[in-house]
Amino acid sequence: MVCVLLVLTGLGANAAAADERVPMGGGAGIVISGDTMCTLTTIGTDAAGDLIGFTSAHCGGPGAQVAAEAAQNRGPVGTMVAGNDKLDYAVIKFDPAKVAPVASYNGFSIEGIGPDPAFGQIACKQGRTTGNSCGVTWGPGQDPGTIVMQVCGQPGDSGAPVTVNNLLVGMIHGAFSDNLPTCIIKYIPLHTPAVV
């Protein structure tokens, strides 16, 4: 314990500044334009060295301010800078002075990018509304590039990362059907599947 304290005290002012940054990772709740709740898909550094993240495009568009749900009192930590409505993804540029990117957020880890899951594979998601849930992969969705999975999703889970064996395979886009029951309790899988 003494060794740990000595190491921590030797870190200096830069470590103290880093500790003030908001930890953000896949599954973190985000607030867009002060009133829309969604979920961060993932976060990392792009080829230009910018700290960026992804969420669903229907959460907001370019220019929208993004705050961390867990630290709304700190104000905006990023801005939506690009997106694609057809593929339903948005790019967020984060302020590295305000955000500390993490690969594991609330116990949900993303260790890389994976291939499209096959029928029957178990996929898991972490959303700001319904938390963590896992379910079977049914197969391709109606729209190109989508997959249907039996994971729990509610409003606010849009953008939630979906993984197979801790590898990112997609994000929550919406519900498979408005004519089927929605997910009320993640432990009861009798609900409409999610479209990823």
Residue ranges and their predicted role:
Residues 25, 32-141, 163-165, 169:
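Serine endopeptidase catalytic core focused on the charge-relay Asp
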Residues 1-18:
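Secretory targeting and sorting signals
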Residues 93-110, 174-196:
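C-terminal cap/linker of serine protease catalytic domains
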